[in-house]
Swiss-Prot record:
Residues 843-931 are annotated as: Disordered. GO terms for molecular function: calcium ion binding; heparin binding. Adhesive glycoprotein that mediates cell-to-cell and cell-to-matrix interactions. Ligand for CD36 mediating antiangiogenic properties. High expression in invertebral disk tissue. GO terms for biological process: cell adhesion; negative regulation of angiogenesis; positive regulation of synapse assembly. Keywords: Calcium, Cell adhesion, Disease variant, Disulfide bond, EGF-like domain, Ehlers-Danlos syndrome, Glycoprotein, Heparin-binding, Repeat, Signal. GO terms for cellular component: basement membrane; collagen-containing extracellular matrix; extracellular region; platelet alpha granule. This is Thrombospondin-2. A motif (Cell attachment site) lies at residues 928-930. It is linked to Intervertebral disc disease: A common musculo-skeletal disorder caused by degeneration of intervertebral disks of the lumbar spine. It results in low-back pain and unilateral leg pain. Ehlers-Danlos syndrome, classic-like, 3: A form of Ehlers-Danlos syndrome, a group of connective tissue disorders characterized by skin hyperextensibility, articular hypermobility, and tissue fragility. EDSCLL3 is an autosomal dominant form. Affected individuals have joint hypermobility, frequent joint dislocations, atrophic scarring, prolonged bleeding time and age-related aortic dilatation and rupture. Homotrimer; disulfide-linked. Interacts (via the TSP type I repeats) with CD36; the interaction conveys an antiangiogenic effect. Interacts (via the TSP type I repeats) with HRG; the interaction blocks the antiangiogenic effect of THBS2 with CD36. Can bind to fibrinogen, fibronectin, laminin and type V collagen. It comes from Homo sapiens (Human).
Length: 1172
């Protein structure tokens, strides 16, 4: 027993030194790459094998490579086993291209090989690099990238590359070279799923990705449950087997039977034969290494045998070890029925028995015997005919069978034995080639240049023989020939003459002279050894041989520039004067083009801009802030055709302004300096040169901006960034605006309870109980919660003896609320002319039902031009002029006055149309008079800051003075609107949940742009707010109104009103005026006959949101009826009416509108006149 264990140890020890153990023949690539559920970018899923995780990779830059030690083992085994198997279960995304396995390095972007499933091409590509040359082998129609699970087996063995999907062989191909012999592990990295580029990463799921060695493809498929259809043939020994595959130290001398063959032409290319020689050289080295290893193992075994004493029969004698048994020298034994082996000098030599042909049709095989035998008697040959010739071999290549037959006369003989004999036959070896695509050979060297000088061509070729396409493989793609230009030495160029020059002028005009001409040898010049031109460079001849006549022009009788003609008799005549002169040719005078063509040069004033010269003319440069040409010419024709054109500069149009990218360039005209201004777009604030974000749309940025020097307006950080407060009031200077400060005066009393919000009064004393503290009450002892102070002297109207401050006590003042020291009262009704709504008609009650500022006693509502002023009070009754501008105060409005400033210069020629300047002084000649330069209406507000630069009655936006118009004045259901004024009239807040009402300003407009910020600072109620324009009376105006939610008005009389959410544009033309009818018609979204007509309603029905800032912009052009309403939410357009045309009213006043909605902020209000 001990002896057997020793022998077993001797057998195992050398075998374990020769290669890897079984556990090293299969590598789990996920395991040796340390890929698990914690790996960044690897998502774990459930695959077909529930016991093993499947992975999808999303971050390929985090995929770890195979462990370096394992990679070294893998590359070593690949070289030893001459290939590998890659098995995996995969689910590849449809039509994607993904890498299964790749080995890269030693460089950063260098790859040694990769296996890629190319979904778009439906191929499995094996790409490998040898000596910098890229090789690609593709298996076609693989069907992997279809988003279905596949069980794949990729085999790279020897020179074969094949793919099994499931149990089916899909395709196989021959490799040009065994690339695995060149693989390097040092400084290299092996990756699963990671491609060389982003588009080559594997997209899908992977499971059970293994590299397998030692096994055959049949074993691997068998483990996967596949049936072995030809398993017996794989290991069978045929007659063509040249050497038996035995143990590592067992040799064989068996050579199968040979058959005579005719010489065949070599079907292999030179490159293939070269590869074969290279492989044989490598095999020779490997065999030598194995032989040396085997000798060392034998020596080690001999030493062990001597050490332990060895078996008696084998000691000091030759012996062989085979199949766990010892055989003595020259001992012969039977391996199987057809193989015998003999021990000779420690080597086992085996022989295969060759069987003779059977002499019968159905030979029998006896157990234990190798060859078949025929069972018949010796006397069976009697009666048979001679054997026929052998048939053709049953196969065309490889091993097959042949038969021959004989006949017997059974009437006279028993004829024992077979009538047919069978024997084996062996033809030429079968063609085992597989389909392969053609490949180009290397390019041949370039040929010599096709010319010896100048430009020629060189050519190189390549052949489609590396390899040659076979078995239906594809031909090479591309051209087999390349040609490119080559440059030889320059060729010699002979010189040639240029054409003769024209003849020179004759040296004399008569009596014979000389003229000459020349030529040059430059067409071309002689170069590179070429010949020079042959002939003369110069040629001469006689000229003007006639006799000289008497010349009357020798005395220069004509004006310079006029042609003189002489005659044989000595007389002469002069031609016409030169261009730019007038005369008979003898005497010529300068032509004054500037006087004859007065509009040659551009002119904006009386200053001449055309300069006459002798001869000709030229224009001065265009005036400042104009650009154009500067003609220069001679003669009347040039003056008529080459006129000067100067156009005003427009930096906004020319894109030469320096406004911020989020600002709008506004052109002010070429007379202004600067000619434009910059305004930040909605959602931004700043000085226009720099703009920052403005969340609450009140014109102040969220953060401080670094604006230009001394430009602080709209550049300082908003002190209430989430609540519109365009005035930025901050009474206590704590950096928090009053609008969002809970205690504006820091007296410890919150604003909601403070009776003096802007004055420190912690004691809250209020003597008159009007909820206004004594410290801030302008009438501390008189109840006056409204705190009205008409003359702004600090004393409230309720306790003032002179409300308007005109030094006339109230009880004697016929206009107690209007300053009028003269106390004029034309109609004697006790109401002074300054405040009388009918100054020429006696009406002491001053009733004004339609709120148009014209008393009912004198209001006839006859207005032929629809500008809001009845004909007998309109200063241009037949021309619409809602603003009633009259700068010379002559009672005739500017719209119909041919001389607005009454300076004697008609408007169409007046360089200051609105300012008296009869001298029309314009020093810079730009067409704008000096007296109105940069301030056209002379109101002391520069045009760049003037909201109406052509109306001195309006200079800035101001709603501090407004008319409150209740639209439903009767009843006590709700209270009237309560308006709070901020920011010098540029911000109004309506605090009450009120009846419909308007706060309308007193400025009147024709064409106008009106914008403002809308904000509801409460979550209570959901009704209407908006603005009015074109206001002429409480029965005639346009209104833009916005409802938060759809709602039916709670009073269904006199008409039922349905209000839909969203922005509406309506025109009011009420026959009843203020009251219930107009109230319900305003609430209703749609048309109400005799009251309201809806021009547009936002089809998206988007209502306003609580605590959200919106910015509206109105454009109104009464001459064309153009109306457009634009509403922004932040920087985005929320509603846009687009162009709406309506000419019901030709202008009017602007105002703000509310209907049953409290805490509405109207901030950063801005109106601007547009002279259109």
């Amino acid at each position: 027993m001990v002896w057997r264990l020793v022998l077993l140890a001797l057998w195992v020890w050398p075998s374990t030194q020769a290669g890897h153990q079984d556990k090293d023949t299969t590598f789990d690539l996920f395991s040796i790459s340390n890929i698990n559920r914690k790996t960044i970018g690897a998502k774990q899923f459930r695959g077909p094998d529930p016991g093993v995780p499947a992975y999808r990779f999303v971050r390929f830059d985090y995929i770890p490579p195979v462990n370096a030690d394992d990679l070294s083992k893998i590359t070593k085994i690949m070289r030893q086993k001459e290939g590998f198997f890659l098995t995996a279960q995969l689910k590849q995304d449809g039509k994607s291209r993904g890498t299964l396995l790749a080995l890269e390095g030693p460089g950063l972007s260098q790859r040694q090989f990769e296996i890629v499933s190319n979904g778009p091409a439906d191929t499995l590509d094996l790409t490998y690099w040898i000596d910098g040359t890229r090789h690609v082998v593709s298996l076609e129609d693989v069907g992997l990238a279809d988003s279905q699970w596949k069980n794949v087996t990729v085999q790279v063995a020897g020179e074969t590359y094949s793919l099994h999907v499931g149990c089916d062989l899909i395709d196989s191909f021959a490799l040009d070279e065994p690339f695995y012999e060149h693989l390097q592990a040092e400084k290299s990295r092996m990756y699963v799923a990671k491609g060389s580029a982003r588009e080559s990463h594997f997209r899908g799921l992977l499971q059970n990705v293994h590299l397998v060695f030692e096994n055959s493809v049949e074993d691997i498929l068998s483990k996967k449950g596949c049936q072995q259809g030809q398993g017996a043939e794989i290991n069978a020994i045929s007659e063509n087997t040249e050497t038996l595959r035995l143990g590592p130290h067992v040799t064989t001398e068996y050579v199968g039977p040979s058959s005579e063959r005719r010489p065949e032409v070599c079907e292999r290319s030179c490159e293939e034969l070269g590869n074969m020689v290279q492989e044989l050289s490598g095999l020779h080295v490997l065999v030598n290494q194995l032989s040396e290893n085997l000798k060392r193992v034998s020596n080690d075994n001999q030493f062990l045998w001597e050490l332990i004493g060895g078996p008696p029969k084998t000691r000091n004698m030759s012996a062989c070890w085979q199949d766990g048994r010892f055989f003595a020298e020259n001992e012969t034994w039977v391996v199987d029925s057809c193989t015998t082996c003999t021990c000779k000098k420690f080597k086992t030599i085996c022989h295969q028995i060759t069987c003779p042909p059977a002499t019968c049709a159905s030979p029998s095989f006896v157990e234990g015997e190798c060859c078949p035998s025929c069972l018949h008697s010796v006397d069976g040959e009697e009666g048979w005919s001679p054997w026929a010739e052998w048939t053709q071999c049953s196969v065309t290549c490889g091993s097959g069978t042949q038969q021959r037959g004989r006949s017997c006369d059974v009437t006279s003989n028993t004829c024992l034995g077979p009538s047919i004999q069978t024997r084996a036959c062996s033809l030429s070896k079968c063609d085992t080639r597989i389909r392969q695509d053609g490949g180009w050979s290397h390019w041949s060297p370039w040929s010599s240049c096709s010319v010896t000088c100048g430009v020629g061509n060189i050519t190189r070729i390549r052949l489609c023989n590396s390899p040659v396409p076979q078995m239906g493989g594809k031909n090479c793609k591309g051209s087999g020939r390349e040609t490119k230009a080559c440059q030889g030495a320059p060729c010699p160029i002979d010189g040639r003459w240029s054409p003769w020059s024209p003849w020179s002028a004759c040296t004399v005009t008569c009596a014979g002279g000389i003229r000459e001409r020349t030529r040059v040898c430059n067409s071309p010049e002689p170069q590179y050894g070429g010949k020079a031109c042959v002939g003369d460079v110069q040629e001469r001849q006689m000229c003007n041989k006639r006799s000289c006549p008497v010349d009357g022009c020798l005395s220069n009788p004509c004006f310079p520039g006029a042609q003189c003609s002489s005659f044989p008799d000595g007389s002469w005549s002069c031609g016409s004067c030169p261009v730019g002169f007038l005369g008979n040719g003898t005497h010529c005078e300068d032509l004054d083009e500037c006087a004859l063509v007065p509009d040659i040069c551009f002119s904006t004033s009386k200053v001449p801009r055309c300069v006459n010269t002798q001869p000709g003319f030229h224009c001065l440069p265009c005036p400042p802030r104009y650009r154009g040409n500067q003609p220069v010419g001679v003669g009347l024709e040039a003056a008529k055709t080459e006129k000067q054109v100067c156009e005003p500069e427009n930096p906004c149009k020319d894109k030469t302004h320096n406004c911020h990218k989020h600002a709008e360039c506004i052109y002010l005209g070429h007379f202004s300096d600067p000619m434009y201004k910059c305004e930040c777009q909605t959602g931004y604030a700043g000085d226009g040169l720099i703009c920052g974000e403005d969340s609450d749309l009140d014109g102040w940025p969220n953060l401080n901006l670094v604006c230009a020097t001394n430009a602080t307006y709209h550049c300082i950080k908003d002190n209430c960034p989430h609540l519109p407060n365009s005035g930025q009031e901050d009474f206590d200077k704590d950096g928090i605006g009053d609008a969002c400060d809970d205690d504006d005066d820091n007296d410890g009393v919150t604003d909601e309870k403070d009776n003096c919000q802007l004055l420190f009064n912690p004691r809250q004393a209020d003597y008159d109980k009007d909820e206004v503290g004594d410290r801030c009450d302008n009438c501390p002892y008189v109840h006056n919660p409204a705190q009205i102070d008409t003359d702004n002297n600090g004393e409230g109207d309720a306790c003032s003896v002179d409300i308007d401050g005109d030094d006339v006590f109230n009880e004697r003042d016929n206009c107690p609320y209007v300053y009028n020291t003269d106390q004029r009262d034309t109609d004697g009704d006790g109401v002074g002319d300054h405040c009388d709504n009918c100054p020429l008609v006696h009406n002491p009650d001053q009733t004004d039902v339609d709120n148009d500022l014209v008393g009912d006693q004198c209001d006839n509502n006859e207005d032929i031009d629809d500008d809001g002023h009845q004909n007998n009070q309109d200063n241009c009754p037949y021309i619409s002029n809602a603003n009633q501008a009259d700068h010379d105060r002559d009672g005739q409005g500017d719209a119909c006055d041919p001389d607005d400033d009454n300076d004697g210069v008609p408007d169409d020629r007046d360089n200051c149309r609105l300012v008296f300047n009869p001298d029309q002084e314009d020093l810079d000649g730009d067409g704008r008079g000096d007296i109105c330069k940069d301030d056209f209406d002379n109101d002391n507000i520069p045009d760049i800051d003037d909201v109406c630069p052509e109306n001195n009655a309006i200079s800035e936006t101001d709603f501090r003075n407004f008319q409150m118009v209740p639209l439903d004045p009767k009843g006590t259901t709700q209270i009237d609107p309560n308006w709070v004024i901020r920011h010098q009239g540029k911000e109004l807040v309506q605090t009450a949940n009120s009846d419909p009402g308007i706060a309308v300003g007193f400025d009147e407009f024709g064409s106008v742009d009106f914008s403002g910020t809308f904000y509801v600072n409460t979550d209570r109620d959901d009704d209407y707010a908006g603005f009015v324009f074109g206001y002429q009376s409480s029965s005639r105006f346009y209104v833009v109104m916005w409802k938060q939610v759809t709602q039916t008005y709670w009073e269904d009389q006199p008409t039922r009103a349905y209000g839909y959410s969203g922005v509406s544009l309506k025109v009011v033309n009420s026959t009843t005026g203020t009251g219930e009818h107009l109230r319900n018609a305003l609430w209703h979204t749609g048309n109400t006959p005799g009251q309201v007509r809806t021009l547009w309603h936002d089809p998206r029905n988007i209502g306003w949101k609580d605590y959200t800032a919106y910015r509206w912009h109105l454009t109104h052009r009464p001459k064309t009826g153009y109306i457009r309403v634009l509403v922004h939410e932040g920087k985005q357009v929320m509603a846009d009416s687009g162009p709406i045309y309506d000419q019901t009213y030709a202008g009017g006043r602007l105002g703000l509108f509310v209907f049953s909605q409290e805490m509405v902020y109207f901030s950063d209000l801005k109106y601007e006149c547009r002279d259109i």
